[in-house]
């Protein structure tokens, strides 16, 4: 499988147990997620989401638990829906027969937190345990609005998922701001993930490189130098 330095996509693809041919086909399918922002279309996103749910990774997952890959995929879908709230009930009707048990659809709707999410939730056949737990599930906006000082790996994943779903530069800029703020901090693992994912995305997608180029111009000289040093350190380590 071609090396893909995306925290978001790697978390999904790495778990796929498949032959080489199947692996390539599934990777091609999953690779449509981080490029969705180039041609956003909520119906295309729904169709892609349904196809992804049919891959072995998710068809074999009857645990009800959210792996990192499943978490990221659902965040992406939730953010697509969040940016297209008028599609909520269409997605709800389509996915009711695709997501079994419907507890997963309840989680998706809670992540999205659109005005009609509650209407969809009322129609779902979900366990009492899940229904009681739904108020504890944060929306994708809660993840993306997290203060830079307290962000962790899940927040980085949510920011990437949100950018892939919308193309909104603010999500990428927040990752760059996190790198600057934590350059001398005590969370090297999250900092490393942020640097690695940003550098990789900049190399793969010119749109992201352009966003960072413009963002650097808004920074004071000292912070601009910190960001550049953090990104350069990856190149010298290779």
Where do the protein language model's features map onto the residues?
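Bacterial N-terminal signal peptides
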Residues: 7-15
């Amino acid at each position: 499988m071609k090396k893909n330095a995306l925290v978001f996509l790697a978390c999904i693809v790495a778990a796929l147990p498949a032959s080489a041919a199947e692996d390539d086909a599934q990777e091609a399918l999953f690779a449509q997620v981080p490029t969705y922002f180039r041609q956003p279309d909520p119906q295309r996103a729904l169709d892609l989401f349904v196809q992804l749910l049919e891959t072995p990774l998710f068809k074999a997952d009857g645990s009800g638990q959210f792996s990192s890959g499943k978490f990221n995929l659902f965040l992406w879908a939730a953010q697509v829906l969040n940016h297209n709230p008028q599609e909520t009930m269409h997605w709800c009707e389509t996915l009711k027969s695709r997501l079994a048990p419907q507890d997963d659809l309840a989680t998706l709707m809670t992540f999205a937190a659109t005005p009609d999410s509650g209407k969809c939730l009322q129609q779902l056949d979900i366990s009492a345990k899940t229904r009681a737990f739904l108020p504890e599930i944060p929306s994708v906006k809660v993840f993306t609005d997290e203060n830079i000082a307290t962000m962790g790996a899940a927040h980085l994943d949510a920011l990437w998922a949100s950018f892939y779903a919308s193309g909104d530069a603010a999500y990428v800029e927040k990752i760059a701001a996190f790198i600057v703020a934590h350059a001398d901090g005590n969370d090297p693992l999250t900092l490393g993930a942020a640097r690695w994912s940003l550098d990789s995305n900049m190399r793969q997608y010119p749109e992201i490189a352009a966003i960072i180029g413009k963002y650097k111009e808004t920074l004071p000289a000292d912070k601009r130098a910190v960001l550049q040093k953090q990104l350069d350190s990856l190149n010298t380590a290779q």
